Amino acid sequence: PYYARTLSSAGITYMWTNSRYSSFSLRPIDINVVDMTRPVDPEFLGNTSNKYLINSFKTQFIGGLSFGYGYNNQRKNLGGNATNIRFNAETAGNLIDAVEHAFFSPAKGKEQYTIFGIEYSQYFRTDLSVSRKIMLGGATALVGRLYGGVAMAYGNSSSVPFDRQFYCGGSNGMRGWTP
């Protein structure tokens, strides 16, 4: 391969339900480190002006929190209409940024703050997925899904980390799309 990276993560997740169909999750601590163990050829990155591509191949520290909500009224072993809704919101870098600005300043010649010598990401990301199954009779159903999201980098970051970007495509189609 042209590069190698190691992904390390740690976190605490609280999950609960308040009804038969609704569930929640909260990750107050969500830490990820993307370590470029074998960086990309500098000549390759030097030939592009795409900041998103360049930042995708940097070592990054991602520390934040996330919240998720799920609603699913499909019953096992029963036919019938069903609705599935998933909402997620995630923010990273804000607590680190507040501490950095209060007590430190960026190293000379650098515009970005670091933690443990690694630039940290600062962004907000949210997404929503809604799917619906309508039984038309017997073993026939009409099924649809809508999915969308928004991600925005700010503060200490000029782009959202590659692992948090949205993309189109999959294993069977639309492979030509890029993040």
Regions found by a protein language model. Give the residues of each.
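C-terminal structured domain segments across diverse proteins
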Residues: 2-3, 14-16
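C-terminal outer-membrane beta-barrel translocator/porin domains of Gram-negative envelope proteins
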Residues: 11-13, 21-179
